[in-house]
Amino acid sequence: MRILEAAHIPYTCLEYAWDEDHLDAVSTAQKLGIEPETLFKTIVMISADNEVFVFCVPAPVSVSLKKVKSITGKKIIPLKLEALQQTTGYIRGGCSPVGMKKHFVTYIDETAQLYDHIYVSAGERGRMLCIAPADLQAICAAAFCDLTEAAAE
């Protein structure tokens, strides 16, 4: 949040009760009383040549590997959970696209632009940031792209 304050980017921080069994983004949206489509989970992926990518997608959907291969030009897979903290500085359920250990190429699903504000992790379990999509894009030097496929019903 210091990064946002230093850049004079407005945001609101929301807190919620969390537990190990309900760390998923849809459960978090329910706890906050917000539409799941406005809560963007942070997915960290890696290519065969160890390039790390960050994707922010709405809670109810999944990253389309076909689409991200088309966007990045690389076949990528999710980063192993054991490597998440060492790579990003964050843990599962508290991984924010803002303030990672290093700058990684970041993409935000284009649906974020439909909302005045979206929610992303504040970098720790139990805290979410409410931020304008354009401000998130600016602070992360991200691109808006079509990244998702509908979640299996």
Task: Map each language-model feature to its residues.
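Extended, low-hydrophobicity, polar/charged segments
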Residues: 1-153
